A protein has these predicted regions:
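Conserved GTP-binding G-domain of TRAFAC-class P-loop NTPases and closely related GTPase folds
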Residues: 1-8, 13-16, 21, 25, ...
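Conserved substrate/cofactor phosphate-moiety recognition/catalytic segment
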Residues: 13-70, 82, 112
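Conserved beta-strand scaffold positions in the cores of enzyme catalytic domains, especially
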Residues: 31, 99-101
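Flexible, glycine- and charge-enriched loops at secondary-structure boundaries
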Residues: 48-55, 77, 120, 124-127
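Aromatic/hydrophobic pocket-lining residues that form π-stacking "cages" and hydrophobic walls in ligand
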Residues: 61, 87-89
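Short, surface-exposed connector motifs at secondary-structure boundaries
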Residues: 67-73, 94-96
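Short catalytic-loop micro-motif centered on adjacent basic/acidic residues
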Residues: 72-76, 101
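Acidic, metal-coordinating catalytic cores used for nucleic-acid/nucleotide bond scission
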Residues: 75-87
């Protein structure tokens, strides 16, 4: 029984903070983060890069975690319904049997405020668009 926690939320909502807290409480879990993957592939988490390369690495890490039966956290915005469906489909295909979505529902004004304090800022119009999609 391999479990996946699918984090959902705006940039600045606290998804990565929640993931870090979960890993502290449950160190046997694995974190798969699209930001970390961007850092590995492109040298910077801020570099968007070709999505297909990021997705290939997500697939690889999902497969490894599922084969090893490691409970996993997937940290990405997952703002669009179709993106969440793709992640759930991939998770099932790679062997995850229990998939739980956790919506980190933070007020958009707070996400925008936090975003302004970050080194790696997401454009405000992008956050507002994601907010409408959620």
């Amino acid at each position: 029984m391999t479990k996946l926690l699918l984090l959902i939320g705006l940039p600045g909502s606290g998804k990565s903070t929640l993931a870090a807290q979960l890993l502290t409480e449950c160190p046997q879990m694995q974190l798969i983060s699209t930001d970390a993957i961007r850092g590995q592939l492109f040298g910077s988490q801020a570099t968007q890069g070709p999505w297909f390369l990021i997705w290939q690495e997500v697939e690889r890490q999902f497969q490894q975690a599922s084969i090893a039966n490691i409970p996993t956290i997937f940290d990405a915005t997952n703002a669009q319904r179709r993106n969440r469906r793709e992640v759930i489909e991939l998770a099932r295909h790679t062997g995850f049997t229990h998939i739980t979505g956790i919506w980190v529902r933070t007020p958009v004004w707070l996400c925008l405020t936090r975003n302004k304090k970050r080194d790696r800022q997401v454009p405000e119009d992008v956050i507002l668009r994601m907010h409408r999609q959620l």
